[in-house]
From Swiss-Prot:
Major location (coarse): membrane
Organism from which the protein derives: Escherichia coli (strain K12)
The keyword Cell inner membrane appears for this protein: yes
Note: TamB is widely distributed across the majority of Gram-negative bacterial lineages and is far more widely distributed than its partner TamA.
Classification lineage: Bacteria, Pseudomonadati, Pseudomonadota, Gammaproteobacteria, Enterobacterales
Domain topic, free-text comment: The periplasmic domain is elongated (up to 160 Angstroms long) and forms contacts with the N-terminal POTRA domains of TamA. The C-terminal region mimics outer membrane protein beta strands. This region (residues 963-1138) consists of a concave, taco-shaped beta sheet with a hydrophobic interior, which can accommodate and shield the hydrophobic side of an amphipathic beta strand, potentially allowing TamB to chaperone nascent membrane proteins across the periplasm to TamA in the outer membrane.
Compartments where found: Cell inner membrane
Residues annotated with N-formylmethionine modification: M1
Residues on Cytoplasmic side: 1-6
GO cellular component: cell outer membrane; plasma membrane; TAM protein secretion complex
GO biological process: protein localization to outer membrane; protein secretion
Name assigned to this protein: Translocation and assembly module subunit TamB
Transmembrane intervals: 7-27
Length: 1259
């Protein structure tokens, strides 16, 4: 073999070995694992925990990668490749899944990257693939990425894609639980601000007119070439749920749907549906990114942002961006408005036509309407370099008269000429003509005219007629201004007082004024200002002469006269003042006399004096007899005295000090200070030293104490208050008796509090002040009167603390009740100005409900223990709570309880932003099981749900109602609605109503309830509406004994409550019953109560007949009642049918008209029966007087066998009944003794003797 052949053979073998090695490493599972192991060993910072499977099912677990500034953790990576697609010249990836991914990037720790030279633009980029690429499924599960202060979190993401040639198709995609937490802009700005070492001079800003001229001299929309996208994109369906962005604003998107495609520059938006916390958006449309850029977009939105909550927006955009663009907007809801606009963005000058129309506009948008604009029409036509503007509307509102506003104006990019602004109101017109120019400085020239203004009709208490003219001109430039009013005239009258204002004036931002004359006149009262405050000289006089202010203006009264003079120069001014006023009155405020005298000069030093005396200041709850203020001296030595005499505050203080102009420092002393207040006198125990340093902007306040008979507040050390400082305040004693004047009569408090506050601040540094506050109570007791009973609450320990340090606020408390439990806890808020994260705990230990027993009457009590162990989490916007609250052994016995409660328990478990409730209410008969849950993950849309189920729970409302109920009800609550649904079965009940109290009187429909101020009370309405839908089933063992009716009830009722009120639907039947009235024993043969609406308006269908055993001739006679409850219709019927007179005779007498019995005897029996029926209450009261319970007088029998019977209980189990015949005088004595609850022994003695054993059955 030749050398060439050997070399060729060796090369071939090497190539085959290389290819075989690559094939082994890539194509086999063992080789692939070997590759990952090598990468784990040789790649710095890479750590692969576990590798399983091959290309068809490859899984990497516990993967980590760390480099300076970069840390990546991956719990699980899965890749499944469809190798069979390679035979078809395509790439198929069946699955690419990432789970539990954690990425942290700190750009400050990363090494600086090398600067990459920008590549030259080589023309449009085309992306295409020579082989089809299919990614069947890509999934992200629990992915968290943090880049500096920005956090991105994805809970679940699934998608797929297909890339063939130039078309990329995104398969149906789902994204759930996306959170993007952005840093606040203010925080980023603070981090990025760096003080420059050298101040570079800034070029002068262009005037606004020149800036606008340059802006509109060329098209707003620059020349645009056709946009060439590198590939065609088709998003079949993108769904998102619970997407949230936080930062300076918090945006939550509940659901989102996107369908869009872009083929060769033609973009089509099939659907964009967004449901977020700010509102709902639905959009669709098309756009072409070439030629004239035609667009056609439709958008509908409903806002959920105050004050425009519920606002509906409809937007339609059509035309072309490079030709004419047309926009239409329709607003409905709090704001109703139509906007139509046409513009050409690609044309210089920005041609623009805008029309705005609205039938009515209100302010505020929600709640009570304070202002209203009707028939608003606004029109803008032309270009921004030459446009006309017009507006028409009518306005009205609170405290403003109805007016019609008309505006006509013309303008360009450098000025606007207000041809006329007319406000037609108060039977006159107000017109404004003006020119506003901003070519160089902002300058104006205007003329305001008042013509025929008459307020008599709109404001009858302040009638006036006014005419006037005001001319003004001025300019504003570089932070300075100047103004000139060459003419100011106002004439007319106010409440028959002549009004005259005449004058001219001019001034500037340097407070230099020239006032040739300004005269104000109102009736006999006048004021005049004349002079100038020049650059150097000061010569200004102001005089007031008001001998008759009474009724000059509504609520004004008194007299005033005075003079103020300003003389000297700017360097050495002098102020002279002498003003006297008497009998001043304004609305409810009155002042008997005011006297002001002053003479202040400023040469090398400011010196002078000022005396102010005010007598008899009076207004509701305030009565000050005298206030005097006296100040005199110079800069070097001056003093001030203040004296106040009156109620509710009186007192005095002295302030003396000196000022060093060179050092800009003032030192002083506050002394002789005391005040009388509603909580007692306060006085200083020592003088307060004051020191103000103007250069440092700092004041020092020396140690001192304020003393009160019930309190002492001290500053133990000097307070230096400035940009930075510290203050310590000690509360040495505070007796709660001080609060008595502010407490209601039903509340009393006693005890002593002590405490301390220590606060330090430094405004030159970021962050909040540092400080702490502590309060400790000793012998504290609060007594609250409830239902005329005192409820004392004594505190063994009462400590409160508050602290703010290291950007964390903390509130703590420990409250231990005497002979009872303890309530303690602490709440922390971290980063109060930023994220405001919550932490802490709340504990309740061995709190016994027996502490409220003093408010109960004899025989009533409460028992039970409350305990809790709760932990706080989350943040202020989304608070979280963990732990459990338990109430065990709770037993409340009282007349107000509808059942006999036995020891019961209730537990509430909190888990973050959700909670569950479980409990059992035990009674002597039956139990009620409570279950529920609550969710406040959306704090503005919280919800709660409670279910109650029970079986034959005995309900007792003495002395009338006993019943067994089986509830199965559900109560649900949201911020907008309370609902109560379910079913209540009443299988057994006994309802007994003997009579109503003699004092029971129905409330008149025209009763008006008054409050403590004798003002009508407004009816209380639920802040949250209540809806109910309850089914009440009345079983077969429900009986009623009321007002002579003894009957059994059955039926079903549907209790419905909504915004219309309470309603009943259903039917109550009376299958059997008896009615005793007016001596007659009637049997209810048919009874129906039909409910369909208000509960007090049932439809009656009742038939009651006389007892056939007490009716002769086998005749049935009765009464039929039909119709609504408030308008029933009663008729007498009989069987067989007969005349009304005969039927009435059988109903009342039990005999027909042709009966042989004596009419007098029958009438006697009927009258006695009627009388006895009406005397039941009187007989009962007589029996109670003699110790006989349930004494009753009744009649028995019919015709000649009629008897008057008296019965009563002489002993709890022994009943005596004595009957005497009305016509035969035969007496019958009956003794009945109860052996057992339903077993009786009865002995009868009369014409016949009998001894019976009776047993009572109930059906």
């Amino acid at each position: 073999m030749s050398l060439w052949k050997k070399i060729s053979l060796g090369v071939v073998i090497v190539i085959l070995l290389l290819l075989g090695s690559v094939a082994f490493l890539v194509g086999t599972t063992s080789g692939l694992h070997l590759v990952f192991k090598a990468a784990d060993r040789w790649v710095p910072g890479l750590d692969i925990g576990k590798v399983t499977g091959g290309w068809r099912d490859l899984t990497l677990s516990d993967v980590r990668y760390e480099q300076p500034g970069v840390a990546v953790k991956a719990g699980n990576l899965h890749l499944a490749v469809g190798l069979e697609c390679l035979w078809n010249s395509s790439v198929c990836i069946n699955d690419l899944a990432l789970k539990d991914i954690q990425v942290n990037i700190d750009s400050k720790k990363m090494p600086p990257s090398e600067q990459v030279e920008e590549e030259e633009d080589s023309g449009p980029l085309d992306l295409s693939t020579p082989y089809p690429i299919t990614l069947t499924r890509v999934a992200l599960d629990n992915v968290n990425i943090k880049i500096d202060d920005t956090t991105v979190s994805v809970m679940d993401f699934t998608s797929g894609l297909n890339w063939q040639e130039k078309t990329l198709t995104l398969k149906p995609t789902s994204l759930k639980g996306l959170l993007i937490a952005l840093p606040k802009v203010a925080e980023v700005a603070q981090e990025e601000v760096v003080e420059p070492k050298i101040e570079n001079p800034q070029p002068d800003e262009k005037p606004l007119g020149e800036t606008l001229k340059d802006l509109f001299s060329r098209p707003v929309l620059p020349e645009m070439t056709d946009v060439h996208l590198p590939l065609n994109l088709n998003i079949e369906e993108f769904k998102g749920e619970q997407l949230r962005v936080t930062g300076d604003t918090d945006i939550t998107v509940s659901t989102m749907l996107l369908k869009v495609s872009s083929i060769d520059g033609n973009t089509k938006l099939d659907a964009l549906d967004i449901d977020s916390s700010q509102g709902i958006v639905n959009a669709s449309g098309t756009a072409q990114l070439s030629d004239n850029w035609p667009v056609d977009i439709t958008l509908n939105s409903t806002l959920n942002v105050e004050p425009l909550k519920g606002e509906k927006v409809k937007l339609k955009m059509g035309g072309a961006l490079r030709e004419q663009l047309e926009i239409g907007v329709n607003l409905s809801g709090p704001v109703d408005m139509d906007l139509r606009a046409q513009t050409r963005l690609a044309e210089a000058g920005l041609p623009l036509n805008v029309e705005v129309n609205s039938k009515q506009l209100y302010w505020p948008f929600t709640g009570e309407k304070q202002y209203q604009a009707d028939d608003l029409k606004l029109k803008l036509t032309g270009k921004m370099t030459d446009y006309t503007l017009s507006m028409r509307t009518a306005v009205k509102g609170q405290e403003i008269p109805p007016a019609t506003i008309t505006l006509d104006a013309k303008g360009n990019e450098q000025q606007v000429n207000l041809d006329k602004l007319t406000v037609a109101a108060l039977e006159g017109k107000t017109e404004l003509k003006a020119l506003l120019d901003w070519q160089q400085a902002i300058s104006w020239r205007g003329e305001l005219t008042l013509n025929g203004i008459n307020t008599a009709k709109e404001f009858p208490d302040w009638p006036s007629k006014l005419n006037g003219l005001i001319k003004t001109r001025g300019s504003l430039y570089g932070g300075t201004w100047q103004m000139d009013v060459p003419e100011l005239k106002l004439t007319g009258n106010v409440k028959q007082n002549k009004v005259n204002v005449d004058g001219t004036l001019k001034g500037n931002s340097y407070m230099q004024w020239m006032i040739p004359g300004l005269h104000l006149e109102l009736g006999p009262n006048s004021a005049e200002v004349k002079g100038e405050l020049g650059v150097k000289d000061l010569n200004l006089d102001a005089t007031i002469n008001a001998p008759g202010l009474d009724n000059a203006l509504p609520g004004l009264g008194g007299t005033a006269k005075g003079l103020v003079k300003v003389r000297g120069t700017v360097e050495a001014p002098q102020l002279l003042a002498d003003i006297t006023a008497r009998g001043l009155r304004w609305q409810e405020l009155s002042v008997a006399q005011v006297r002001v005298e002053g003479d202040i000069k400023s040469t090398d030093q400011i010196a002078g004096k000022l005396d102010v005396r005010v007598e008899q200041i009076s207004q509701p709850d305030v009565n000050i007899n005298l206030v005097t203020l006296n100040a005199k001296g110079s800069e070097k030595q001056h003093e001030l005295q203040l004296r106040i005499q009156g109620e509710p505050v009186s007192g005095q203080l002295n302030l003396a000090g000196s000022f060093d102009r060179k050092e800009e420092r003032w030192k002083g002393t506050l002394s002789n200070t005391r005040f009388q207040t509603p909580v007692g006198p306060w006085s200083l125990t020592r003088d307060i030293a004051l020191d103000y340093r103007n250069k440092e902007q700092k004041i020092s306040i020396g140690p001192h104490c304020w003393l009160n008979p019930n309190a002492e507040l001290c500053v133990p050390q000097t307070i230096d208050a400035g940009a930075e400082g510290r203050a310590v305040v000690n509360l040495n004693r505070f007796d709660l008796a001080m609060l008595k004047p502010f407490m209601p009569e039903t509340t009393q408090a006693s005890g002593i509090f002590t405490g301390k506050a220590d606060v330090a601040w430094d405004t030159t540094k970021e962050g909040l002040p540092q400080g702490s506050i502590t309060l400790s109570g000793r012998n504290v007791q609060v007594t609250q009167t409830v239902n005329d009973a005192a409820l004392p609450v004594a505190f063994q320990t009462l400590n409160l603390t508050a602290e703010l340090r290291n950007n964390r606020a903390e509130l703590g408390w420990t409250i231990r009740l005497t002979n009872n439990g303890q309530f303690d806890g602490q709440v922390q808020v971290t980063d109060p100005q930023g994220r405001r994260n919550l932490g802490g705990n709340v504990n309740i230990r061995n709190f016994n409900l027996a502490m409220i027993n003093p408010i109960f009457t004899r025989g009533e009590k409460a028992a039970g223990m409350v305990s809790a162990n709760l932990r706080l989490g989350g943040d202020v916007q989304s608070p979280q709570l963990f732990g459990q609250l338990q109430v065990t052994g709770v037993d409340i016995d009282g007349n107000f309880m509808p059942f006999d409660m036995q020891p019961s328990q209730l537990a509430v478990n909190f888990n973050g932003m959700r909670s569950t409730l479980a409990g059992t209410v035990r009674t002597q008969q039956g139990e009620i099981y409570l279950n529920g849950d609550a969710d406040w993950s959306q704090i503005e849309n919280w919800r709660a749900r409670v279910t109650a189920k029970g079986s034959k729970v005995r309900i007792t409302v003495p002395p009338m109602v006993r019943m067994d109920v089986s509830p199965d009800v559900v109560f649900e609550a949201t911020p907008n609605l309370f609902t109560l649904d379910g079913r209540v079965d009443v299988p057994w009940a006994r309802i007994v109503v003997h009579d109503l109290p003699e004092s029971a009187v129905g409330v008149s429909s025209d009763v008006v309830m008054l409050n403590d101020n004798l003002q009508p009370e407004e009816p209380k309405t639920a802040s949250i509406p209540i809806n109910s839908n309850l089914i009440v089933h009345v079983g077969n063992n429900v009986r009623i004994d009321a007002f002579g009716l003894k009957a059994r009830l059955t039926g079903d009722l549907n209790v419905v409550q909504d915004k219309q009120g309470l309603g009943l639907n259903g039917q109550i039947n009376i299958p059997e019953g008896r009615f005793h009235a007016y001596g007659q024993d009637l049997i209810v043969r048919k009874g129906e109560l039909l409910f369909s609406g208000p509960p007090d308006q049932p439809y009656l269908n009742i038939e009651a007949i006389r007892n056939p055993d007490a009716t002769e001739d086998d005749v049935i006679a009765g009464v039929r009642v039909t119709g609504l409850a408030d308008e029933p219709k009663a008729e007498i019927f009989s069987d067989p049918a007969m005349s009304q007179q005969a039927a009435l005779s059988y109903l009342l007498r039990g005999q027909g008209l042709e009966s042989d019995q004596s009419d007098s005897a029958a009438m006697t029996s009927m009258l006695i029966g009627l009388g006895v029926a009406q005397s039941g209450q009187i007989v009962g009261k007589i029996g109670e007087t003699f110790g006989v319970s349930n004494l009753a007088l009744d009649t028995q029998g019919v015709g000649d066998s009629s008897q008057v019977v008296v019965s009563g209980y002489v002993l709890p189990g022994l009943q005596v009944k004595y009957g005497v015949g009305i016509f035969d005088s035969i007496a019958t004595l009956t003794l009945r003794y109860r052996l057992m609850p339903k077993l009786y022994l009865e002995a009868v003695s009369g014409v016949d003797q009998a001894l019976d054993l009776l047993y009572q059955f109930e059906f």
